[in-house]
Amino acid sequence: MGRDLGWCFFVATVLLAAVLLPAPTIAGRLELKNEISGVASVRKAKLAVRCWSNEDDLGWNMLKPKQSRIWKFTTMNMWPFQKTEFRCQFRSGFGTTNEDVVTVFSVKDGFRKQCGVGGDECFWVAKRDGFYLRRIVKDGGGDSRKKYVDVLKSKWVWKW
């Protein structure tokens, strides 16, 4: 009898944990887009980007105006292993971001909520006046287009 009760308690605990705990892994998506416009020189409108995670160095990429770079990955989202984080450096003809290194994706809840609805996708946009987080405020639903607002995170600054 005691053994059956212990077994039932164990099964109930496992089921409760499976329901209440977040999924240990999720599909993440990071997109960087160059929307620098109104510049006579294409060279000045290019965006140099170097990104890396805890495990991978994604190297330098050069984005011309209207180009984007997308990375898809699997995140680890189970305490105490919440570790998936991507950081980038940005250089444009207008300077660099205030911070030399910008965290552009993290599985930490506070960060993911900044990205908007769902929190598993983060969109960043370079414009002539600075660097923006494109926050999703409505996930299209029946309409296939997402609604978003661009939140200025850093004006371009000269550090050289």
Curated annotation (Swiss-Prot):
- Which is a GO BP term held by this UniProt record? rejection of self pollen
UniProtKB keywords: Secreted, Self-incompatibility, Signal
Chief subcellular location: secreted
Q: Where in the cell is it found?
A: Secreted
Which stretch is the leader sequence? 1-27
Question: Which superkingdom does the taxonomy of this entry point to?
Answer: Eukaryota
Q: Which family does it belong to?
A: Belongs to the plant self-incompatibility (S1) protein family.
- What's this protein's name? S-protein homolog 13
